[in-house]
Curated annotation (Swiss-Prot):
TM ranges: 11-31, 64-84, 89-109
Alphabetized InterPro entries for the sequence: NAD(P)H_OxRDtase_bac/plastid, NADH_UbQ/plastoQ_OxRdtase_su3, NDAH_ubi_oxred_su3_sf
Designated gene of the protein: ndhC
Protein's UniProt name: NAD(P)H-quinone oxidoreductase subunit 3
Protein's organism: Gloeobacter violaceus (strain ATCC 29082 / PCC 7421)
Coiled-coil segments: none
Family: Belongs to the complex I subunit 3 family.
This protein's record includes keyword NADP: yes
Length: 120
C-alpha cells in the first residue's frame, strides 16, 4: 500500500493542475482546423458579419453598476472568513463587523440617493 504524506498530495495536485491545461491546449492545437487566409483573421460576432465600429462609448450606468457590484463583492470576500470563524471570535470582532457593514450600508444609501442605481 502506498501512503502519501501531506506534501505528496499537494505535489500531485500541483502537477495535475499544471498538466491538465497544458494537455487541453495541446489536444486542441492538434485537432484544430488547419485553414489559412483572410477568413481566419475576421472577427466572429454570433455567426453574423460584424457591422459598425467596435470602439463605442458605453453608458455611464454600466460603470456605476459595476463599481457598486465590486464594492459589495469585496464586502463578501471580507465577511466570509468572519462568518466561518464567528463562534471562535469574541464580541469585539462582532462589533467590528457591524461597523464594517454599517459603513457599506451608508455607501449603498449614498449611491441610491445619488441615482447610481437608477437605470432610467
Amino acid at each position: 500500500m502506498f501512503v502519501l504524506s501531506g506534501y505528496d498530495a499537494l505535489l500531485i495536485f500541483l502537477l495535475l493542475s499544471a498538466l491538465v491545461p497544458v494537455l487541453a491546449l495541446t489536444i486542441s492545437y492538434l485537432i484544430r482546423p488547419k485553414g489559412s487566409g483572410a477568413f481566419r483573421t475576421t472577427t466572429y460576432e454570433s455567426g453574423v458579419d460584424p457591422r459598425g465600429d467596435s470602439w463605442i462609448q458605453f453608458n455611464i450606468r454600466y460603470y456605476m453598476f459595476a463599481l457598486v457590484f465590486v464594492v459589495f463583492d469585496v464586502e463578501t470576500v471580507f465577511l466570509y472568513p468572519w462568518a466561518v470563524a464567528f463562534n471562535q471570535l469574541g464580541l469585539l470582532a462582532f462589533i467590528e463587523a457591524l461597523i464594517f457593514i454599517a459603513i457599506l450600508v451608508v455607501a449603498l444609501v449614498y449611491a441610491w440617493r445619488k441615482g447610481a442605481l437608477e437605470w432610467t
